Curated annotation (Swiss-Prot):
It comes from the Bacteria. This is Homoserine O-succinyltransferase. It catalyses: L-homoserine + succinyl-CoA = O-succinyl-L-homoserine + CoA. The record marks 192 as: Important for substrate specificity. InterPro entries: Class_I_gatase-like, HST_MetA, MetA_family. The lineage of its organism: Bacteria, Pseudomonadati, Pseudomonadota, Gammaproteobacteria, Alteromonadales.
């Protein structure tokens, strides 16, 4: 089954061109199926690009999914037309009474700021507490993963001396966990971050398990034993050219970024990257939707408040 998105959302034409089955809301309304309700709290500056990346990952399951795009505040994003935000996004306050089967909280380019200096940190804390009562399973990406661990368990990130950027090999640490079902023992994923929380810090929290990690990146996929919280410290959603765009953006800005590791063939930016992460990225989200969301969510979402 497809993801359900608004008929006029620009992401629809991009996904259709990639042969991804997308159903607009008009057609979906004719089917007598209770779709999964999934929210995407999009914290990235380029909302439209991020929408496509996560919608692509949500599309590869037999489940019908109704997607709400959510903004955390009314501040106009720098790289997205306000007309797009008004047409396709809901303010968090407007969905605060709703329950969701799943919620994705994206990353944000805020690694160099203390949490208390993030302009929407107080609202972010409200969202994190709200999700405990309104969402069956929440997946936090990159910055959001660190922010959630800090809020819930007081584990603060440290800043690396140099940005971690590139494609890195990871090892599955718990092959029996359903989130890792079908994964190769070693698989690749993109990272682009300054912040890091040690494997030991994750493992020190009762009820959390590190499911995949590497010596270079540290913990990559971490999940709570009750399947309600998933922390992904990298970017499995990234497009083939995402790291290339970041690298060239920083060069243009007069910075001296390190070249993304294991990304360009022969470390030559003139060559397109060899994509080695998309299959496992898709599998991660398929497993999350199936085993952590669909097989655990109540039919009556209103009962989620009893799980908090």
């Amino acid at each position: 089954m497809p993801i359900r998105i608004p008929t006029e959302l620009p992401a629809q034409s991009i996904l259709n061109s990639e042969n991804i089955f997308v159903m607009d809301t008009d057609r979906a309304a004719m089917q007598d199926i209770r779709p999964l309700e999934v929210g995407i709290l999009n914290l990235m500056p380029n909302k439209m690009e991020t929408e496509v990346q996560f919608l692509r990952l949500l599309s590869n399951t037999p489940l019908q999914i109704n997607v709400d795009l959510i903004r955390i505040d009314n501040q106009a994003p720098k790289n997205t037309p306000e007309s797009h935000m008004k047409a396709f996004y809901q303010n968090f306050d407007d969905v605060a009474d709703k329950q969701y089967d799943g919620l994705i909280v994206t990353g944000a380019p805020l690694a160099l700021l203390d949490y208390d200096d993030v302009k929407y940190w107080q609202k972010m804390k409200v969202v994190l507490e709200w999700a405990q009562r309104h969402v069956q399973s929440t997946l936090f990406s990159c910055w959001a993963a660190h922010a959630a661990l800090y809020h819930f368990h007081g584990k603060n990130r440290r800043l690396r001396d140099e940005k971690l950027s590139g494609i890195f090999a990871h090892q599955v640490k718990d092959e029996h966990n359903e989130l890792m079902r079908g994964f190769d023992p070693v698989f690749h994923a993109p990272h682009s971050r300054y912040g890091e929380i040690s494997v030991a810090d994750y493992e020190s929290v009762e009820g959390l398990s590190v499911l995949a990690s590497s010596e270079k990146t540290g913990a990559y996929i971490v999940a709570s034993d009750d399947k309600r919280l998933v922390f992904v410290t990298g970017h499995p959603e990234y497009d083939p050219d995402s790291l290339d765009q970041e690298y060239k953006r920083d060069l243009k800005a007069g910075l001296t970024p390190n070249m993304p590791e294991n990304y360009y063939p022969d470390d030559d930016p003139a060559q397109g990257p060899l994509v080695t992460w998309r299959a496992h990225g898709s599998l991660l989200f398929t497993n999350w939707l199936n085993y952590y969301v669909y097989q655990n969510t109540p039919y009556d979402l209103a009962s989620l408040s009893n799980k908090a």
